[in-house]
Amino acid sequence: MRYPWFRLAIFVLGCLFPLWWFYEAAMGLLGPDPGKIMMDRLGLGALVFLLITLSMTPLQRLTGWSGWIVVRRQLGLWCFAYIVLHLVSYLVFILGLDWGQFGVELRKRPYIIVGALGFLGLLALAVTSNRYSQRRLGARWKKLHRLVYVILGLGLLHFLWIVRSDLKEWAIYAGIGGVLLVMRIPPVWRRVPRLMGGRGRAA
């Protein structure tokens, strides 16, 4: 297995945050509504993992280090794990597993539908993020996994709908996502290594 320490570090970090948040909740450190805070943190964590996952290919392109690509799938699966925990937190802490209330919530809060669509997209990517699916799907596999950019848009829209009153934090994540998307435009993508190489030579 290549870069085992890098993989292990990501695994430890991926586990550490939810465990710490659960500890804070158990110790009564998250205020009067710990379930909502847990849900919000897990959702934000999923968005962060998604942005980090999308940054792996540009980082490999810029630095030439293959380790970024090696951990890309692992990061994507952590994003999915966090979004599953986010959904479970919503169902348990917010709805109290009241499935009848879930239908009411869908009608009252459209951002939940947006979030659900993002979850289904991530589910499709997680299920097919293996070599068997790559072989079976062939060229269609890459097309399917381009859905990640649609999922990013859905995640940012979901986040925007929730934090309508304070857009500062949202703007940071949206800006990072925008830069990552612009970098994937073919003319930009082709020029970035040249710019970095030129800068390196100048230095």
Curated annotation (Swiss-Prot):
Its main location: membrane. GO terms for cellular component: plasma membrane. Binds 1 FMN per subunit. The keyword Zinc does not apply. The chain crosses the membrane at residues 10-30, 37-57, 75-95, 110-130, 147-167, 169-189. One of its GO terms (biological process) is protein repair. Its cofactor is FMN; heme b. Keywords: Cell inner membrane, Cell membrane, Electron transport, Flavoprotein, FMN, Heme, Iron, Membrane, Metal-binding, Transmembrane, Transmembrane helix, Transport. One of its GO terms (molecular function) is metal ion binding. It is found in: Cell inner membrane. It is a multi-pass membrane protein. Part of the MsrPQ system that repairs oxidized periplasmic proteins containing methionine sulfoxide residues (Met-O), using respiratory chain electrons. Thus protects these proteins from oxidative-stress damage caused by reactive species of oxygen and chlorine generated by the host defense mechanisms. MsrPQ is essential for the maintenance of envelope integrity under bleach stress, rescuing a wide series of structurally unrelated periplasmic proteins from methionine oxidation. Belongs to the MsrQ family. Heterodimer of a catalytic subunit (MsrP) and a heme-binding subunit (MsrQ). NCBIfam families: PRK05419.1-2 (NF003831). This is Protein-methionine-sulfoxide reductase heme-binding subunit MsrQ.
